[in-house]
């Protein structure tokens, strides 16, 4: 099975201190997997330009097809993700006029609704309209800060907000449609066996024989072992199941 690789970087001091649980990376990984991408690595860094720059450079050096970065796009002093990415790919930040107008309209709408006192487009708010040179803005339907999409050395880089509602909306509307069709399928099964150590050699043999990926974990208080099979198509998964059943293991689909 040929794997199309993806990586995820989440940004935020609050993630490193444990004050906020990183649900974004789990959601992004799940959606990428459903689209047929193999998430090889998830990295978390703080709100530091150099740390972000280094993490992005290292990810690019591993040549994933897709790199998704989430967090650090807001108006505060420690929202520096765009600058970190720009530095990593050797670009300058450039004002996106369309983004600036969108941000202006966003704050004016909040003011009309009585949610903020001042709609002025101050420097902190203007900062969100600066994107890495050569990037394409990604529309934020749930907040002020635009995302960005840029290709560099064959890697598709998507920069998304850290607020989960904003990130999810942008991922669904702006990112996933650009990624095309799935590259593999996955199916979940319950194996009627209580001892992982007895199942392990069977799975190792199966992985080598069929060139698939298999993840296993105990389920149902030891009554079952849950397995997820990743393969090129349903036909291969069917062959895998029949092969393992030939070793005396019974299955039922789903968890």
From Swiss-Prot:
Gene3D superfamilies: MoaB/Mog-like domain. CDD domains: cinA (cd00885). It holds the Pfam family MoCF_biosynth. Belongs to the CinA family. This is Protein PH0439. It comes from Pyrococcus horikoshii (strain ATCC 700860 / DSM 12428 / JCM 9974 / NBRC 100139 / OT-3). The lineage of its organism: Archaea, Methanobacteriati, Methanobacteriota, Thermococci, Thermococcales.
């Amino acid at each position: 099975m040929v794997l199309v690789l993806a990586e995820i970087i989440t940004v935020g001091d609050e993630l490193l201190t444990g004050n906020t649980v990183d649900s974004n990376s789990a959601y992004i990984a799940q959606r990428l997997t459903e689209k047929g991408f193999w998430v090889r690595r998830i990295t978390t860094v703080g709100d530091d330009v150099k740390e972000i720059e280094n993490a992005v450079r290292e990810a690019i050096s591993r040549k994933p097809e897709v790199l998704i970065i989430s967090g650090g796009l807001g108006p505060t002093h420690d929202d520096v993700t765009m600058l970190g990415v720009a530095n990593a790919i050797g670009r300058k930040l450039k004002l996106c006029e369309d983004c600036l107008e969108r941000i202006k309209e966003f704050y004016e709408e909040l003011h009309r609704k009585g949610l903020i006192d001042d709609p002025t487009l101050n420097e902190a708010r203007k900062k969100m309209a600066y994107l890495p040179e050569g990037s394409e803005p990604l529309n934020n339907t749930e907040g002020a800060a635009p995302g960005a999409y840029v290709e560099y050395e064959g890697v598709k880089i998507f920069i998304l907000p850290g607020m989960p509602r904003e990130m999810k909306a942008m991922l669904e509307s702006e990112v996933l449609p650009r990624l095309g069709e799935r590259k593999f399928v996955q199916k979940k099964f319950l194996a009627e066996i209580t001892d992982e150590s007895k199942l392990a050699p069977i799975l190792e043999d199966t992985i080598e024989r069929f060139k698939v990926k298999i993840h296993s974990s105990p389920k149902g208080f030891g009554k079952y072992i849950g397995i997820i099979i990743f393969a090129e198509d349903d036909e291969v998964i069917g062959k895998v199941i029949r092969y393992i059943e030939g070793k005396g293991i019974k299955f039922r689909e789903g968890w």
